[in-house]
């Protein structure tokens, strides 16, 4: 896809990575990232107490050491090809923007909760802009789940294999109804 190719090219420009951080408040992680030399940012707000940071390899390593010293239960480097959802993906922006601009996007029947803003929208222009912004902006999954609950969602269904997102949702609100839907593909 255009997105994958553009991101791969951005990854090849500079060694970069991501790390999972467990057991610290968002503000502590953000402060340590800001205080670390080099590029390292909060990239995924997965659920309370679980973030992923993203950036230059030495900066992520230094942040992990500082996060461990600050009391993180874990600060674990992830086996990924780049610093996704960080400023290091900026070189991919133009190609992705061109691909998204050429795609047919119409107003959806129900609001789309995009995790750049954690807010619902039906505006095709906003949808396009946020699809591009997600390259360099953090995934605000925790905030998205909280907004969906506050907006009156009665339940959520995870589409695709596994139940990772359901598990994250349960860490925000254990009582909230979740389910999953998967289509089995026949082998040819």
PLM ranges: what are they?
Residues 1-137:
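Alpha/beta catalytic cores of group-transfer enzymes, especially the acyltransferase/condensing modules
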Residues 101-188:
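Acyltransferase/transacylase module recognition
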């Amino acid at each position: 896809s255009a997105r994958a190719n553009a991101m791969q090219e951005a990854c090849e420009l500079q060694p970069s990575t991501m790390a999972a951080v467990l057991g610290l408040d968002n503000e502590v992680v953000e402060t340590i990232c800001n205080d670390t030399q080099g590029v390292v940012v909060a990239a995924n707000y997965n659920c309370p107490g679980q973030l992923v940071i993203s950036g230059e390899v030495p900066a992520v390593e230094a942040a992990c050491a500082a996060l461990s010293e600050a009391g993180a239960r874990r600060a674990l480097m992830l086996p990924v090809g780049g610093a996704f959802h960080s400023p290091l993906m900026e070189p991919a922006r133009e190609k992705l923007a061109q691909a998204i601009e050429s795609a047919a996007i119409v107003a959806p029947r129900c609001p789309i909760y995009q995790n750049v803003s954690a807010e619902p929208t039906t505006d095709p222009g906003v949808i396009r802009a946020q699809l591009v912004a997600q390259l360099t902006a953090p995934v605000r999954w925790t905030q998205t789940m909280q907004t969906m609950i506050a907006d009156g969602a009665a339940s959520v269904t995870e589409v695709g294999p596994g139940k990772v997102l359901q598990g994250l949702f349960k860490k925000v609100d254990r009582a909230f109804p979740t389910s999953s839907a998967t289509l089995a593909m026949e082998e040819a």
